[in-house]
Amino acid sequence: VRGEDYYKGLRMKSDIDSNSKNQGKESKSSLNKTMAEHYSDSHLSGGHLSYLDKLYDTFLSNPDVISKDWKDLFVSLSETDDFKDDIIYSEVVDSFKNKVRKHQNNRKEYKKVSNGYFQKTLPLTIHGKVNYYIDAYRSFGHTAANLDPLQLAQKDIHIDLIYAEKLLEGVSPEERVGNDYPKGSKNKIFLKELKESIRKKYSGNLGLEFSHISDERERNWIIDRFENDDYKEINSDEKIFILKRLISARGLAKYLSAKYPGMKRFGIDGCESLIPLIDTLIEQTSKNNAEQICFGMAHRGRLNLLINVLGKKPKDLFAEFEENYDLKGSNTGDVKYHLGFSSNIHTSNGDVHVSLMNNPSHLEIVDPVVIGSVRARQDRLNDKERNKVVPILIHGDASFSGQGVVMETLQMSQTRGYGVGGTIHVIINNQIGFTTHNPKDSRSTRYSTDIAKFIEAPIFHVNADDPEAVIYISKLASDYREEFRKDVVIDLIGYRRSGHNEADDPSSTQPVMYKKIKQHPSVLKSYKDKLIQNNDVTLEEFDEFKKSYRSSIEKDKSVAHNLSKIKNDDLWFEWNQYIDAEWDKKTDTTVKQDQLIDDAR
């Protein structure tokens, strides 16, 4: 493409001709030119550039058709280094235009159709169409997934999914295809089977986001695991486990509601699947060789976690409700849904120490505290692989997208000085932030979890009304963290059955949503009905499970799943030595030279 040098050359030629008449004299600047000199080179002014372009192209293609003066000027230019082997500019332009036309004829073309979407007209092979279909669902299947238990959220299905479906409309469902689905498969299956399978996988009650991850190895790992696993293939014992944990979550909420009506408890009614989710994370993280797990969370669901997971005694919680508890020892007088706890939980891989950090009212501010505690524990254990101590942060959907400390904590996740080998983030997504339900009023992104994309963390969305899917995605998240030592997000999408703190009436601000919620069965009822229908449990057994839980609560028995009954000294830290300690006491702070050298590496 002809640029500035071309016109600079024309101007230089004019100056040379002018200066040749004044050899031996000092060269004149353009500012000192006479009117006659300006007139003599006025044909080279900037206003004539378009004309000069065409004239020069004519000279290059047929020099005899232009006047002698112009021909002499262009001949003298062609003898300089800047203009040797010059080519016709218009031919360059035409060449590019032809390339664009050719590309437009071959590229993926879309035309408007009556339904307001698009249809591609480019003919593709069946193999190419199926490949496009698979890739579209892997990347955007989550936009069509059944993630909202209330079915209130309007789906914004990605255009690639719409096109992928239209692309295969003319292909016989009996066509046998083999396109690396499931990942690694060499077998051919009927097209109708492939479509049904991939829709259930990527647009069922699970929605996976991982196409934003730049590392192909990570993407392929997720695809391989997800497509070759069947989360619905669980045995009867696992189903009973899920049922009992849902009974625990729902049972505590109903008990507290009846015993302390109108009092704040910030329950997880509508997201009860959180309890089996956390139980599964503890079990799976322990299988991945974790010795300690540190939890951080705000008030939502905290009481349920304390009683049903960590093993806090029911009477201690009731005393906090009644505000007659002893302030001696570790009690601070803070509200019950801010207090921390720790215990040992027995898993199939041995005991694991679990801690829940104290938390103030300020949402998400506990996040960096948890990460700092985990890093300190890892350093104390010389845990260079960063798998002995694992952080799990439980967020609200509104606070995760709205609080700046979340982004700040995520930004430090892969740094050398502050990284902990990945955090498992769990979002209690009840689709309402205090009184705001419509995402258009609360954020500028499709999902509340989109902030995690900037560190390329995979995001696993799951419908909270499908506890079996919740269990599966918990295992997948824990295994991803173990494999890649990176953050991972579980978006547990449910609803909030009561008001913000059980003392308010949410129907005044969200009447449509809460009319739907009142008609919607709890996840416990839905799952119980499913198991009874499939003969996995009887109604009598279910009623007995409920009575047993209620009896344990009333008798002040621990209702946590697999709470360790044997004190493991290796997992307990003795804090008594720090109580009433002399803080100005001299302490040996020397470090061995080998340790310093090792740390420097």
Model feature map: region roles:
Residues 36-87:
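Subset of Sec-pathway N-terminal targeting signals
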Residues 54, 58, 62, 73-76, ...:
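Generic, well-ordered alpha-helical scaffold segments in large soluble proteins
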Residues 291-456, 460:
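Cofactor-binding active-site loop characterized by glycine-rich and histidine/acidic residues
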Residues 435-445, 453-489, 493-499, 507:
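Conserved phosphate-handling catalytic cores of large alpha/beta enzymes
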